[in-house]
């Protein structure tokens, strides 16, 4: 039974779970989705919200400390926020919008703070980085070392590789229409691991460019 959203952590040695956050400013988390850690060990995450039969929540983007001491709602509202990532220099936050198939960027100006564009230039404060149009949806994302943003793309099934300036560098097509996630691994970070959700497969794909090392992981 659904009781709300939360951010939990697990002790890899014992397998024990503990809950860090269930709300922010007395507003319950609804459906935390994707997460990315910065170089300080704090993290940003998207909350897509709860989807019901005839309506859905307006989502949010949060920043929080990994010790459970502080959480901030940084961006709200944001319709269907999903994939989230940081630029190589940690100065730009990228957020993928699922339903519109759009990619937004935010300039990080301080700890847990972003610069927001005013309405009507932006409806959520972010810079619209890419909106290629057509029938598609964006899901999770990962970055290449050169700064390109690789976004898992639904409906037409593939990975949209978008430059920091917003240009579509390439579209890597797959047979599965529900490509939902991507991350980089292997010794040289030139192997992409991609989830094909319609067929329920995890794909291992050789990638032409090196993936961006994640903080505290690919070291």
Locations of regions flagged by a protein language model:
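Short, solvent-exposed loop/turn segments at conserved positions within beta-propeller repeat blades
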Residues: 1-5, 49-59, 98-101, 154-155, ...
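Loop/turn-rich, solvent-exposed surfaces of beta-rich toroidal or solenoidal domains
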Residues: 101-102, 106-110, 119-169
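Blade-level signature of beta-propeller repeat domains, shared across WD40, Kelch, NHL, RCC1
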Residues: 180-219
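A short loop-to-beta-strand structural motif that recurs across blades of beta-propeller domains
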Residues: 5-8, 59-62, 102-104, 158-160, ...
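Short loop/turn segments immediately following beta-strands, especially the blade-tip
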Residues: 10, 106-115, 205-214
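Beta-propeller fold detector
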Residues: 18-22, 72-76, 114-130, 170-173, ...
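Flexible "stalk/tail and boundary" regions
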Residues: 9-16, 62-72, 146, 156-171, ...
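Beta-rich, blade/repeat-based domains predominating
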Residues: 1, 6, 25-43, 60, ...
């Amino acid at each position: 039974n659904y009781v709300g959203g939360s951010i939990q952590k697990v002790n890899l040695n014992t397998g024990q779970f503990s809950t860090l956050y269930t709300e922010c400013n007395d507003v319950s988390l609804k459906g935390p989705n994707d997460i990315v850690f910065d170089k300080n060990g704090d993290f940003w995450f998207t909350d897509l919200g709860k989807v019901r039969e005839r309506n859905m929540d307006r989502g949010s983007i949060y920043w929080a400390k990994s010790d459970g001491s502080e959480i901030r709602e940084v961006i709200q509202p944001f319709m269907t926020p999903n994939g989230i990532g940081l630029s190589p220099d940690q100065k730009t936050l990228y957020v993928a919008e699922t339903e519109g198939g759009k990619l937004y960027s935010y300039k990080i100006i301080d700890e847990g703070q972003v610069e927001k564009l005013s309405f009507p230039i932006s409806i959520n404060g972010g810079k619209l980085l890419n909106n290629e149009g057509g029938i598609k949806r964006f899901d999770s994302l990962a970055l290449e070392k050169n700064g390109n943003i690789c976004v898992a793309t639904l409906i037409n099934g593939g990975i949209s590789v978008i430059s920091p300036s917003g240009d579509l560098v390439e579209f890597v097509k797959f047979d599965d229409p529900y490509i939902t996630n991507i991350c980089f691994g292997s010794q040289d970070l030139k192997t992409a691991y991609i989830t094909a959700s319609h067929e329920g497969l995890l794909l291992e794909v050789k990638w032409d460019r090196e993936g961006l090392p994640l903080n505290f992981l690919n070291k």
